């Protein structure tokens, strides 16, 4: 059958040639004609064999030598190794426009990256997150962190914090969009191999739903471009990254807000949120729930000069107390709630060679001012570890901060975090009511840039704080830290690029500990530690 097909194909292929050369063929002898036919048949058979072999290669796996080879472990090697197809640079997509064939091809080329982005946008789902994890050991037993909020994070961090966010677009038509967002955060213990949530004797393993809200665009006629949200969510946080605390933070149980509302030269963020607190009595054994509400208002992205923007912010927290709650405060020894506020401004300057610096000035009173006076973590909370207590008498505190990074030439980069703060007549969680304090903390992190993927440097941290209580007794807390590190990176920025893998050696020393009485293992005032840490966001 195959032979008959070959002959038939040969005749069909030669027919046009024979017809076009009829006049020439009439002058040839019979022998010459047979010779031409045999030559044409051989060429046709050769061509058909070529196509047949190519078809076989498509469906037959490539084989290796018939003798079975073994690998280093003595196992037989795979006689049919998988061939890896080269990743295409682009894909062809069909145009949906009806007149595409009139204007050109109905197909167009799209890079694989753009095609992947298109598919993600079409699905409308995104999964974002952050976590850190690592190993460390110290000279006196288990390594301990101390004063991260003053001495810096590198080589002083042994937690496994995570944030995981799920976002799904549920509507996007006619200029209106609706997204559902859920975020979980918490910590996974880095000390024991088991990390069950709820098995939390060491206080390490915990998780919460920190966000669960709906955000929209296009529903407000006066602000169609703004993000209007409702649910469990707070105003955006602003972090001093090297110290791991926030200059702007409004926690929320639930709320309603508007972000990126264009007004004049800048944008407005406004949020009204609920944040109930547990109000304790003076024994710190009994508590009652108090309903509080916060208004957080920010006017941001105000242009000043080239690559410089300004933000002005204000926050006010007020209680909505019941009669029984007020009675407990008046007659049963519960601490009185005092409304608290914070306002300030920040300036961000970006640099031509990359990098930035952010300067902020903040003033607060009552319980927020009390948190300005914390040397370890100094986020502007209204409580201390979730508990509201203390005799707040309207005292105020001031905070000045600087953070950022700058490139020096082609091979050096320096990051910084510097904070100066002071307060008068505040409630201190260490020295009580009517306390004054003054604090300075400074962390610098210079590094040599080997290439895009490698940096070697040192993080130097120092802080000192003095509190004076109502009787004018003075209490001092101070210390320093030196961390040598090498990092594997994906970009040269210290503060804005992740993932990052760090190898470090740290020496940390407590010079004075009159506020907290802290010691490392074996009652030592210093610690030498080595370790490795991975930090990633996506």
From Swiss-Prot:
Query: Which terms are listed as keywords in the entry?
Result: Cell outer membrane, Ion transport, Membrane, Porin, Signal, Transmembrane, Transmembrane beta strand, Transport
Give the GO terms filed under biological process for this record. monoatomic ion transport; polysaccharide transport
Q: Which residues are listed as membrane-spanning?
A: none
Signal peptide location: 1-25
Q: Which Pfam families match?
A: LamB (PF02264), Sugarporin_N (PF11471)
* Cellular compartment(s): Cell outer membrane
Coiled-coil annotation reads none
Q: A Gene Ontology CC term for this entry?
A: cell outer membrane
- Tell me where it mainly resides: membrane
Tell me the membrane topology, using the record's own terms: Multi-pass membrane protein
InterPro entries documented for this protein? G_neg_Bact_CarbUptk_Porin, LamB-type_porin_N_dom, Porin_LamB, Porin_LamB_sf
Q: Which GO terms describe its molecular function?
A: carbohydrate transmembrane transporter activity; porin activity
What does the UniProt function comment say about this protein? Answer: May be a sugar porin with a broad carbohydrate specificity.
**What family does the entry list?**
Belongs to the porin LamB (TC 1.B.3) family.
| Protein name as catalogued | Putative outer membrane porin BglH
Q: Which organism is it from?
A: Escherichia coli O6:K15:H31 (strain 536 / UPEC)
